[in-house]
Amino acid sequence: MSSEQGNGSNPSTSPEVEGTKTIPFRRRLQRGQRVFAPKLMEALRRSRVSSEEAPVRHLSRRWRATTAQKVYSLKLYDALQRSRRSATVRDTADKVLATTARGATRWSRAILVSRFGTSLRRRRNTKPASALAAAIRGSGGSGRRRKLSAVGNRVRVLGGLVPGCRRTALPELLDETADYIAALEMQVRAMTALSKILSELQPSTNLGSAL
């Protein structure tokens, strides 16, 4: 990456070339594994040990596997190199996370089909709060009716926090929420480890500071 910066080329737009042949995506991933995979595995191992001290109730096991974190980290590293300047790290990280989930859940499919990740997060962060405030102001009737209304409002708030689950039945909503939380925890661990590795290998690059 340092040689590309010295030549004045943009690593996010120019393809990686070896001789006269463009290096395919699979080979770039393999090269990335050889460069920093050992350090990545060690960092992920340490983060996984520390995370195991916290309760793991209702968390999806697939996101706790070191292999999933390794695959996500390598895909994220390659995506950040190829991303446009207008794309934020958060948007790229969320899209790679949804791609890693392979569209097996509602939240991952919602992120993949969303054209505006920022507006999606804005709706996810602001509307639940306004809905909760309206529920508090408009609660009335008998005690049992107020209790049922409060439960329904909380379910709607929870559905607004998870992408693609605004109108999902409660049992499926709980499963989606558990999987989404586990995926976000894995994302934090992987991005933290990747940021440390990039800062050690290339302390002067903008990619490490952006994470």
Swiss-Prot record:
Assembly description: Homodimer. Interacts with PRE3 and ASK7.
Biased composition (Polar residues): 1-15
Places the protein is found: Nucleus
Gene Ontology cellular component terms for the protein in this record: nucleus
Region (Disordered), start-end ranges: 1-23
Annotated TM spans: none
Annotated GO MF terms: DNA-binding transcription factor activity; protein dimerization activity; transcription cis-regulatory region binding
Main location: nucleus
Name by which UniProt lists this protein: Transcription factor bHLH150
InterPro entries assigned: bHLH_AtIBH1-like, bHLH_dom, HLH_DNA-bd_sf, IBH1-like
Post-translational modification remark: Phosphorylated by ASK7.
Biological role: Atypical bHLH transcription factor probably unable to bind DNA. Negatively regulates brassinosteroid signaling.
Gene Ontology biological process: brassinosteroid mediated signaling pathway; regulation of DNA-templated transcription
Limits of the bHLH domain: 135-184
Keywords: DNA-binding, Nucleus, Phosphoprotein, Transcription, Transcription regulation
Xref: CDD domains: bHLH_AtIBH1_like (cd11444)
